[in-house]
Amino acid sequence: MSVLVITGTDTGVGKTVATAALACAARVAGIDVAVCKPVQTGTGPAGGTGDDDLVEIGRLAGVDALHPGWRYPDPLAPVAAAERAGAALPTRDELIGMIRAADAPGRLTLVEGAGGLLVELGQDAVTLRDVATELAAPVLVVVAPGLGTLNHTALTLESLAAQQVPCAGLVIGAWPAQPGAAEIDNRDALARLAPVRAALPAGVGSVSPVDFERISATAFDPNWLAGLL
């Protein structure tokens, strides 16, 4: 299996845009790529206009192999969203099964989590870290550039190391057009914690798909991309 799990140090750090950028870069590089979103909250009522991260990823990245999982209307943590919907969370076996079903020989399968690494995604308090552990998959961590990011990032990396889950590196999800001293210093400090694979421009998720492809295609080291397979 060639599965890469993508998490974030916090909500709103740019995880979905980073997933789309990586999927786009892989596609441009000629890699067969699929994207899974096992658990999505905030989808709104049926037929409404709630969040749909996979639709946004497909629009930006030009990727068709999109695999949705369990969806809940309220924009809450999965446990709370499932409770409010009167619905069950998936079991560990169901989570693992959907990801394995999406994967294929020669394919890179990206798995975007919901929230951070230790957010409960499934029954019996199953987290994204548990999923990565069972799949023996590395984890790419999307981070913020501003104050507080060093502590948040270090805690996430420490949590991965505690279960011997390899970190595939960091992506800065929204690099400002005019970074201040904090952002510049933090970028250097983040690189000492783990390799920074990309620093995506703030607002890149709002550009046209053509511009998104141009930016994404050069955001990641092609040798690193090829090594994900």
UniProtKB/Swiss-Prot annotation:
Gene Ontology BP terms: biotin biosynthetic process
Residues at which ATP binds: G12, V13, G14, K15, T16, V17, D53, E112, G113, A114, G115, P201, A202, G203
Binding locations of Mg(2+): T16, D53, E112
Localisation: Cytoplasm
GO CC field: cytosol
Superkingdom to which the source organism belongs: Bacteria
Known EC number: 6.3.3.3
Catalytic residue positions: K37
One example GO MF annotation: ATP binding
Annotated catalysed reactions: (7R,8S)-7,8-diammoniononanoate + CO2 + ATP = (4R,5S)-dethiobiotin + ADP + phosphate + 3 H(+)
Entry keywords, A to Z: ATP-binding, Biotin biosynthesis, Cytoplasm, Ligase, Magnesium, Metal-binding, Nucleotide-binding
Any matching Pfam family: AAA_26
Family that this chain belongs to: Belongs to the dethiobiotin synthetase family.
Quaternary structure (record): Homodimer.
NCBIfam families, sorted: bioD
Cross-referenced HAMAP family: BioD
Protein name in the entry: ATP-dependent dethiobiotin synthetase BioD
Originating organism: Mycobacterium sp. (strain JLS)
Gene: bioD
